[in-house]
Amino acid sequence: MKTIIVALLSMVFFVNNTNAQGTEESIHRVGVVINQDYFLKFVKPGLNQDRNYTMGAALPVFQYAKMGEKGWVYAPHRFLAKSILGKSVTNYRLADATVMLANTTFTPLYLGNLHDPESEYKRKNDRPFASLNFIGTSFGVKQDSGNELLSIGINVGAIGLDVSKAFQTTVHRDHWFGTVADIPYGWEDQISDGGEPTLLVSGKYDWLIVGKSDGSGNNKGNFQLSANTELRLGYYVSGSAGINTRVGLLDKRNWGMNTLPISSGYSIVSSQKNPFELFLMGGLKGNSWLYNALLMGQFRNSPYTLSFKQLNKFTMEWNLGVGTKIPFCKNRAIRASVMAVGRSPEFSTVKEFERWHSWADLQLYYEW
């Protein structure tokens, strides 16, 4: 962990020294994203159950729109954006290019106590252990008006590595943060144990409904409402539609929001001339599902998986939190947000294993 932090800080200072005098559109953003149900114990102790979506982290997240202009990394993103927009692509301009290294972890309530006489019953009817490690890239273009945004994401990684197993076992065994949870012994039965390549391609379209910039140059506002729709193909086959809102001291150009687990919450890399912001934010999203590899397995046989019949074909998600941007010096700022996120049951087996679950989303960025 110390090595990762040192590398992150070194990258920040190196890029800062070489690019701090960029143009208005060359803003950089580097930061971290942490998803953890542990932090909800301070709201209500019962919400921290190490269950379902247990934890996730992206370290670092780096955003710089000009990365997407050329090169092979974002060539698929540019191709997909042009294919979707067709001739209207000339009315759009680059708004974001993001790269991150990330992990997500999923566990059942039952952590593998082999002395439990109901062990097999619990393993078969709860969700399986699952983990995903990936390099995520995203590319966004917004309409010239600034009120519509198309985002293309591609995640390349592996399901079934031992990163989550090692971290969770260490935390529970050594009682980090005062945890008294059981040591997990079920990771040997995780989805695709030993590792298996995986891929996800996503396309998301956001449009601003209320709080649009009027083009006068006055971008201050107090309320914004946007809608979005998304399609995901790969280790997830699903679609979604939702709404997001921001209320407070706003720069209306910064309306783009992303509430997916382990993603930059800010899908527009705006200009360096942003004012102070402080706002409440919230959203509601409905998801339709045909496939979830982290529940149903992928190509490799896994001892515990859920069937298509057991997969809930419709789920709901909500989010509520607070965000801020604090500018300092001439072109620099700190951006931070804290958000609670909830999700309805993802599968149907027996009632004791079906539940809404929630987690905290923490994001911190340095901009220059």
Language model features with spans:
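Long, hydrophobic/aromatic-enriched structural stretches that serve as scaffold segments
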Residues: 78-167
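Short loop/turn motifs that connect adjacent beta-strands in outer-membrane beta-barrel proteins
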Residues: 21-27, 65-95, 142-151, 207-225, ...
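Transmembrane beta-barrel strands of outer-membrane/channel proteins
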Residues: 28-36, 97-105, 154-160, 203, ...
